[in-house]
From Swiss-Prot:
Gene3D superfamilies for the chain: Exonuclease VII, small subunit
Sequence similarity: Belongs to the XseB family.
SUPFAM superfamilies: XseB-like
Organism in which the protein naturally occurs: Syntrophus aciditrophicus (strain SB)
Record's protein name: Exodeoxyribonuclease 7 small subunit
Function: Bidirectionally degrades single-stranded DNA into large acid-insoluble oligonucleotides, which are then degraded further into small acid-soluble oligonucleotides.
Length: 79
């Protein structure tokens, strides 16, 4: 089974949230949707963690560059 891509998982998660927000699901459907949402959320977080590690490894290969954490808006943290 091929790995699910981040973009695919995020699109599924967004669609699932929209469906749940309508309030038209039964309790059982809502529980199944919630479980799937948790799975997709964890998958997306894992893919983002993997991408962050890859970027840090690439930066570490260049000894003149230091790794700086990013703020939530994506800008460098200059502290």
């Amino acid at each position: 089974m091929a790995k699910e891509k981040f973009e695919e998982a995020m699109a599924k998660l967004e669609a699932l949230v929209r469906k749940m927000e309508t309030g038209d699901m039964t309790l059982e459907e809502s529980l199944k949707a919630f479980e799937e949402g948790i799975r997709l959320s964890r998958l997306c977080a894992s893919r983002l963690d993997d991408a962050e590690r890859r970027v840090e490894m690439l930066i570490a290969e260049n000894s003149n560059v230091t790794v700086q954490p990013l703020r939530e808006n994506g800008e460098k943290n200059e502290s």
